[in-house]
Amino acid sequence: MSPLAARQSPSETSAFFQVVDAFDDGFSYAYSPSIILKDGTYHVFFCSEGGGNYPSWDAIRYTTSTDGETWSRPKVVLQATAKNGEDMAACDPSLVFYQGFYYLYYTSALTTASKTYQGVIQVARSVSIDGPYLTFTQRRTWENTPTDPNVLIYPLEMHCAQPSGYGAGQQSVIVQNGQLLMWYTDDSVFVSGQPQVKTYMLQSSDPVAWAPEGTHATNLVNQASIDVKFDLSQSQFMMIRVENEFSSTSYLARSYSSDGMSWTAPQAVYPSGQFPQYAHDAGIAGDEIGNVASPSALVGFGVPYGLADADNWGHWDLYAGYVDPP
């Protein structure tokens, strides 16, 4: 069991349960899940500590459950090589099925100067949801842990000095009307010399060809790490996010949009006091093309070990609950 500090009160945590015990499973953290409900099984891909033969910061692990209560032991499905100052991480997964393949979009990073990095978006794919996942390369091949992964999306502006900001990443991808839609974070266009977090929306019919532009910014500002699904019952896009993340007043909220560009103000699903403290990086269950699970959807998020009442950076379990529970 994860080492615990003082636990949060039952009123804040009774609706939530552990999906991944990072400490027991041999790594330091678990967060930012991409969740697909397929044929009665939850498939959860999440960001976790890198390891093995590769010195990358992060790796993507995978766990499953048929009841939302008992979960398989997580296994690594995607690693980065950190070769030549590139491909520094495999994090923030977003999985979608398109034209016969499961495409696993993920955030990596590259070195722009000494101890200076920016996030970028890359992709791997598989014919089966449980892998193996092969990464798209600069040679336009698909290979296992290549040293030359192809960067699909760079930050709008590259920075070779501090502050460099986060870069581009934290993507959320769905399929709508035969097209791939992506929302992602980019803070590289500075305001008054400082990074400003914006969310951008892109569309493509080619999984490895995207065209970022500053004109594709949504009305979301300072709303990093979102997860978007399509709500068939309302014929609208739905966004889920932990507001006030990494704080004692964190809460779960959602927004709606008819076009994916203009979003309503976030409304609390679980307000502060009814949601775990210091939570962050949520993902909500949907089908394999990104329609939100109905009538009740599993939502996962990172939180301090065992719901500890402390901001223990980098020591996170993956917890979950249900939006619109029966």
Annotated model-derived regions:
Residues 171:
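Polysaccharide-binding and catalytic clefts of secreted carbohydrate-active enzymes
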